[in-house]
Amino acid sequence: MSRWNGVPAVVLAAGFIAMNCCFSTAAEELPQPAFPCSRETIARGVASRFIDGRTFILDDGREVRLAGIEVPPPPSPMQRGTAPEGAAARDALAGLLAGSEVVLRQAEPQKTDRYGRIVAHAFTARDGVERSVQADLIAARHARVTARAGNRACARELLGRENAARRAKLGLWATSYYDSLDADNPADVLAEQGRFALVEGKVVSVRESGATIYVNFGRRWSKDFTVTILKRNARNFTAAGLEPKTLAGRRVRVRGWIEERGGPLIEAARPEQLELTDRE
């Protein structure tokens, strides 16, 4: 059963009323300096149709997926109940882009994904100022950061905006559904297999085996939550102040896609997937 079904409707309603009343001013709450996600322009156009909170169709038929963020899925006829967060994210994207030219800037080495969608950072101009669509969606509490943002400075910028949005406890952060899962409850983590999630807990040990580093959040490797880091990527974590062997005893928030390898697991390919939270 999805964690969505356990969220009281009155809590969601209150959260989304607050979110909707604050959306028009959310961007002003987080002023945007020179933006590190701005790179080579790869396309321009006007959005004509919106699939969900991060996917839209340009007027020439090309499909675009916003890089670096995850949003709730839109309501589906096959889904039990309703998903107001998904509809709110899609409506927010439409509000940001409808009728305006959108500039798409390269986010990853490959400009399109395996489905042929352009993967990009999107920008619009308002009052003569260029604004990041991803940053505005995060600031308005409609999206979470995946850390696949194209470069580390960009990921750090988006993570900072997400943390500010989380502290406001509005939108996605009004309920526990989209906040961090507890690493001490591996069954709850495993229930999200195949989905993007945030997981937080205290690291019990760090071990190496073959080409992999195992960051263990429990003593039972076959049941407890684990994060894996390939040794060839370890220097990137060390350069970011996250040397794997020093994580034991620290409280860490991890983001990524939940897999099952005995117990629940996230593979961390980028240091931006890990945040130290014992000093928050």
Model-assigned labels for residue ranges:
Residues 10-14:
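Sec-dependent N-terminal signal peptides
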Residues 2-9, 19-280:
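Small beta-barrel nucleic-acid-binding modules, primarily SNase/OB-fold domains
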